[in-house]
């Protein structure tokens, strides 16, 4: 196995073996930890800080629950009343928290590569990228890969279709990287041309501007919301809804046992119809549940740095 990176900043730093072992460990935490309400002591005595400069429900709360289930102390500073609001630089804040004994820095920021810049400032400790701009969101990709494998265990036979605002989606970037690493042979990106990336960088990735053809023979369908905060409001929401909203009629074009995913937050009746979001093919809430277990596995691995302890 290749050496584990010091920080979790992007998906390309993880090998297939890293990802498989993380999924295995997360499934353990799901069955032996969460379902039994167990608390572990792996992170006992360690301090985790959630530094979220953008809104979050699922990611921030699941990291907090994950850290507490591993025995850590968790800080959730109100950044609006922190010293940053008085003019202190972000990096001085980081060094201050490090001096207080914080070991894990869970960082979400609107600017690309801010977590990487923070990692360069640390003498010790670990930075986990919880989403930076439209760049990367590695823990969400790991959750999505875990969820896919629970239903579709053979990576080399999968067709995964990702629908929506892919150009501005850090979730899509990380998921594509992860799917390529796992050897998925067919990855389809679907949306209006203005919301698709200019380049895809891998032969397994194809672009579509019509929904129904992209769904043929799909095993996994991932819907994404419009990232309105990351671009101007030039997207015609009604036109997007009419062409790219996943409805029961359109879902019929996919395989009968296809699963439907969404990383959240869901904008119902825009990218996905409620009848699809709530039907038996939807695994959206399973993704949320898996989120705590996978983030437990991530925190444990980046502390112990060795799968032999698993």
Swiss-Prot record:
GO terms for molecular function: amino acid binding; aspartate carbamoyltransferase activity. L-aspartate binds at residues 86, 170, 225. InterPro entries: Asp/Orn_carbamoyltranf_P-bd, Asp/Orn_carbamoylTrfase, Asp/Orn_carbamoylTrfase_sf, Asp_carbamoyltransf, Asp_carbamoyltransf_Asp/Orn-bd. It catalyses: carbamoyl phosphate + L-aspartate = N-carbamoyl-L-aspartate + phosphate + H(+). Its EC number is 2.1.3.2. Belongs to the aspartate/ornithine carbamoyltransferase superfamily. ATCase family. This is Aspartate carbamoyltransferase catalytic subunit. It comes from Coxiella burnetii (strain CbuK_Q154) (Coxiella burnetii (strain Q154)). The lineage of its organism: Bacteria, Pseudomonadati, Pseudomonadota, Gammaproteobacteria, Legionellales.
